[in-house]
Structures are given as C-alpha cells and as structure tokens.
A protein has these predicted regions:
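Alpha-helix N-cap/helix-start motif at coil-to-helix transitions, marked by capping-box chemistry
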Residues: 42-45, 95, 126-127
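Mixed-charge interfacial surface used for oligomerization/domain docking
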Residues: 2-3, 11-19, 24-30, 86, ...
C-alpha cells in the first residue's frame, strides 16, 4: 500500500483538510480573473466569496489547464522518493488535461524506468470527482495494489452520479450551454436548468424546471431514482455550491430526510474557481453512487 501515492487535480473540489486527512495529493489548475492569473488552490489565493462576488459584478474569467512541464515538476519528487503514482484527471469531457499528464508520464518513465505512473480519466468533475477520489482512498487503504486500483477505477467511475442545477443562467449562456434566447425567456420565467454528466464526462442539460423550489425537489428526485439501493442508500453524498449555500443546505436536508442510512452527513463543499469560472454563482451540484449515468 505504501509504494504508491494517489493524486488528482484541485478541481475535485474537496477541502485542504479533506485531501490531507485521506492522504490524497493534488495539483492546481489556473484561472484568470480580469486578466490576472491565480492558481485554483482551494480558495487560498482568492476566497470563494470574493471570487463569486467578482463574477456577479461582471468580472471576466478564463481557465487554463495544467501543462506537461508542470506535471513533470509535480510528479518527479514522488518518483525520486521511490513512489509509484496513480493520478486521476479531471474529466476528458471537460478538459484535455489528461494529454498533458500523459506527456509527463512518458518523459518521466524514460528517466525513472523502475517506477510506474498510471494516468486515469475520472470522467467526473467537482465534488463528484472528489467522491470518486474518496472511494479510491478507501480502496488503497483496503490494500489494493496500484494495478488493481487502476482497474477498480475503470470499472466503477461511471457509478458516480452528477446532477446540477442553476438559478443564474448568465454564465451558461456565456459558455454556450444555453442559447441567449432561451436564457432570456428562462430568466423571465424563473426557469432553472437541470443538468448531469454523461458517460463521456460531459455536462449537458436534461430538463428545464420552473422555480427554485421545484428544481430542488427535482434534483433530489433524481437521486431517489438512481442511488444505489434506493431509499436504503448507505454510502456518502456530496454537494458542491457556488455562492448559494442556503440552496445547498435545502437539498442536503431533503437528501438526509429521504435517505436515513447515509454514510455520515451530506458534505457540502464550494465549487472551485476552475469549474466555477464556467458555472458562475447560483449552481448547486449533487453527487452520489448509483446506477450507470443517464444517457
């Protein structure tokens, strides 16, 4: 168990304490806010409330993925220390960062032929990615070898269900996920899009629901339909939110009411600055283990 480390990108949207307590290493994405670059470092360089307030006030954001040289600099100290590496990337349906990681792997395995680097596509995002990493840590702690854990991820990653809704369509329109016309009409009618992540790791709209109250009920209904063992679901549930904590708490309360056997309380995290640059404020995301994702 101690001959390899597990690693991911900061876009798993867990807290520093959570990463540390589970012995999960991470590397930071980058983003720009009004032309100034910052690391996506779990809100340390810029607190999340400040980031989302800036977006709400019209600040322009832009994200950039980790390049191969950064991955090499990040991976190499582990290799020098005699460790193999399992790095799980943010979904290839959202970013091409896995390509940078693969280039770094090729270069470093030439330099350290006795070491092994496994790069795996999570096909997940935000705290859904974090939920997967948490289970990966469980499997590592249970004694799985590096190769066994890689195969476990490939077999189970699509069981992580992601459901999102937003009460602010501004940034979905800007990102092209919703047309300007649909966004204008949606704003007038208080329509909240409900989205999920597909088998390809892409975020797509599934339905349009009028009013926040109804979309909160609808997202929990999706968990009722898809959670492993239905109302007897006994695993963890994570929620991510972008400057709408009360909405996230409302979802968590319904989840805890319907699923009395949850493994602990629902964990609410902030949507980080990379994912948040595309969603903007007003997004709540619900993550749980369940059936294969809706196609």
């Amino acid at each position: 168990m101690g001959d390899y480390i597990i690693s991911c990108c900061s876009t798993a949207d867990l807290t520093e304490e959570h990463f540390r307590s589970r012995d999960i290493h991470y590397i930071c994405f980058h983003y720009e806010l009004d032309g100034k670059q910052y690391p996506d470092d779990l809100g340390k360089s810029m607190p999340f409330p400040e980031f989302y307030a800036a977006m709400a006030n019209g600040a322009m954001t832009k994200t950039s993925q980790i390049n191969a040289e950064e991955f090499e600099a990040y991976f190499e100290p582990f290799l020098k220390d005699g460790k193999d590496i399992l790095h799980v990337c943010l979904s290839s349906g959202i970013t091409g960062v896995i390509n940078s990681a693969m280039i770094a792997k090729t270069n470093l395995e030439e330099k350290y032929p006795q070491r092994k680097i496994c790069i795996v596509d999570s096909l997940a995002a935000s705290s859904g990615y974090g939920l997967l990493m948490d289970k990966i840590a469980d499997q590592r702690d249970a004694g799985l070898s590096l190769g066994e854990l890689e195969q476990w991820i490939l077999a189970h990653r699509l069981e992580v269900n992601h459901w999102f809704f937003s009460t602010d369509l501004t940034f979905y329109i800007r990102g092209g996920r919703i047309s300007k016309t649909a966004g204008f009409v949606g704003g007038l009618l208080n329509i909240c899009p409900l989205l999920n992540v597909t088998d390809e790791g892409k975020l797509i709209p599934r339905s349009k629901i009028r009013t926040k109250r109804k979309v909160i009920a609808a997202i929990v209904e999706r968990m009722k339909e898809n959670a492993a063992n239905g109302a007897d679901y006994a695993d963890k549930c994570y929620i991510s939110q972008s400057a709408c904590l009360e909405d996230a708490k409302a979802v968590a309360a319904l989840v805890e009411e319907y699923f009395p056997h949850l493994k602990g309380k629902v964990e609410i995290n902030d949507i980080g600055t990379t994912i948040g640059s595309h969603t903007g404020p007003g997004t709540v995301a619900l993550f749980f283990w369940g059936k294969r994702r809706e196609r």
